[in-house]
A protein has these predicted regions:
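Active-site donor-binding acidic/aromatic loop of nucleotide-activated sugar
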Residues: 12-20
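Short alpha-helical donor nucleotide-sugar binding micro-motif in glycosyltransferases
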Residues: 20-21, 25-30
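A short hydrophobic beta-strand element within the catalytic core of glycosyltransferases
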Residues: 33-34, 57
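Aromatic "clamp/platform" in nucleotide-sugar-dependent glycosyltransferases that forms part
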Residues: 38
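Short hydrophobic beta-strand element within catalytic cores of glycosyltransferases
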Residues: 55-59, 69
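C-terminal alpha-helical cap of glycosyltransferases
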Residues: 98-102, 119-140
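A short, well-ordered alpha-helix in the C-terminal region of glycosyltransferases
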Residues: 105-119
Length: 140
């Protein structure tokens, strides 16, 4: 359906559907993942980035960022702004980027990200489901 919309609008020269891309090798070239969205769900890119041990910076929005960013541990959560004050938002983001690269404990940052990601390994998720099913089916 997306392909048809792209063709209908003659946009195939500049819109290309690439499918899922494995970014594991790409993440190895970076130290930091920035999540600039003002709303976020459980994002696969967030999980991939934290699983690659990257430092994380994002806005303190419900779900995704709060799940993967432990403020002052593996990066920074930037408080939400009540209104769209773009200069203040950009300044807050820039301040946290500078603070991140001024840290002397980047090895700790990377380890915290790895530790967060461990909770999302297939074996961990399977065990959580098994525990839930056992809890729900036990007759006390």
């Amino acid at each position: 359906k997306l392909k048809a919309i792209i063709e209908e609008n003659q946009a195939q020269d500049y819109i290309h559907l690439k499918g899922h891309q494995d970014l594991t090798e790409v993440y190895k070239d970076y130290e930091l993942y920035l999540s600039g969205s003002k709303s976020e769900g459980f994002g696969l890119t967030l999980l991939e980035a934290v699983g690659s041990g990257l430092g994380m910076i994002g806005f303190d929005v419900r779900y995704g960022n709060q799940t993967f960013i432990k403020d002052n541990e593996n990066g920074y959560l930037i408080p939400r702004f009540e209104k769209d004050d773009e200069p203040a938002i950009v300044a807050a983001l820039a301040e946290k980027i500078v603070a991140f690269f001024n840290r002397s404990d980047l090895d700790h940052v990377h380890q915290v990200s790895y530790d967060i990601a461990k909770g999302f390994l297939t074996e961990e998720i399977e065990q959580k489901w098994l525990n839930l099913v056992k809890e729900m089916t036990s007759h006390d």
